Amino acid sequence: MELKETFQKVKAASKTLGLLTDEQRNEILQAVADAIIAESPALLKANAEDLAKMDKANPLYDRLQLTEQRLQDIASDMRHVSTLPSPLGKVLKDKTLENGLHLQRVAVPFGVIGMIYEARPNVTYDVFSLCFKSGNACVLKGGKDANASNSAGVELIHRVLITFGIDPNVVTLLPATHEATGEMLNAVGYIDLCIPRGGKKLINFVRDTAKVPVIETGAGVVHCYFDKDGDLEMGKRIITNAKCRRVSVCNALDCLLIHESRLSDLPVLCEGLAEKQTKIHADAKAYEVLKGHYPDTLLYKAEESEAKMKEADANVKSIWNTEWLSMQMGIKTVVSEDEALDHIATYGSGHSESIVSNDETAQKKFQAMVDAACVYVNAPTSFTDGAQFGLGAEIGISTQKLGARGPMALEEITTYKWLITGQGQTRA
């Protein structure tokens, strides 16, 4: 496969975006949002083709599925992005040197952003809206599981762009093949930034293979630590929401860490989990407390579960670093906050972590010591989301430290350049 010509067209098209005013970009985004609602039957039909090929028990099924409500949410997010202030031209630094030179550091687009993602057709729309608003062209490489959904979405966007006289190559969908991924990752000079959004396997492959700049997003092994001074009812609400609101997303809870002095409260903390039929893989202490108080068919010994997982997959190192993406989670007993912090440092992915505690000292220590993009006190990790943060749609959750970190929205997909104005000065 040879995609060089495709990348050349995208690069050329990206230059035309600089000619658009923010008002024009906003009008086009609103038109695409309107088209999503108007053409929702066709979009759902394409999505049904993808869903028919996937087992409903697959953790990716929920991510893949589009509904009328989800399409309305996608359109609403796109309209919201159109109302946000443009990041372009924003003066980040302004100074005049002693020699009279005037310096400004201003925000500009990256140029062409490559996005690699799995069975999540909503990402197609989110990436387009954020890239278009920020003056970036985008190259999309979706998973084969969502190929019909992604194709229908990009075709819709193209139709709207053409009616406004915009080169449709500003958003390009690549074939859903492994070869296309490799070509994108090696498209030096054409792709200015690549963002993978998916599981560990995808993230690791991109990081190890790419020759173009990469920002890692996605994989989350998420913890909630219930401290010795945690409020029981608050903890129950937070744990249930963090785990059960939507299990297939990267901010969903994977492991509850509970202070051993609060083990007697574990059955109450897990009531909401039982109602939602959540499978629990508990360590020995937690298992003994839950036995008889939690449905037998949903309660497992973590040690035995880990052995079965390792038998099925030689790459499994520990049950505690599992991103479940399903109605399953672990529970681990700790003797102190320090042990909880050590556990998170060992098994966490730097995504989102939370503590439930009324002890201000414990709260501040947790915030200071946890190395993650988003650190919560008395709130569920389900809030890690660009829209929830008031950023509009997100292009991903960055788990790295260089460049963007946390929810990536408009500002995070711009770079900057220096503008220097003089009056004929020369350097000695």
Feature map (PLM): residue ranges:
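Conserved C-terminal structural/oligomerization subdomain of aldehyde/semialdehyde dehydrogenase
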Residues: 311-428
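ALDH superfamily catalytic-core signature
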Residues: 119, 126-134, 163, 202-322, ...
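N-terminal Rossmann-like NAD(P)+-binding subdomain of aldehyde/semialdehyde dehydrogenases
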Residues: 1-102
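Residues at or immediately preceding the N-termini of alpha-helices
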Residues: 3, 22, 232, 263, ...
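Rossmann-like NAD(P) dinucleotide-binding subdomain of oxidoreductase/dehydrogenase enzymes
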Residues: 83, 92-233
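Flexible, glycine/charged-enriched surface loops at secondary-structure junctions
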Residues: 22-24, 165-171, 247-252, 279-285, ...
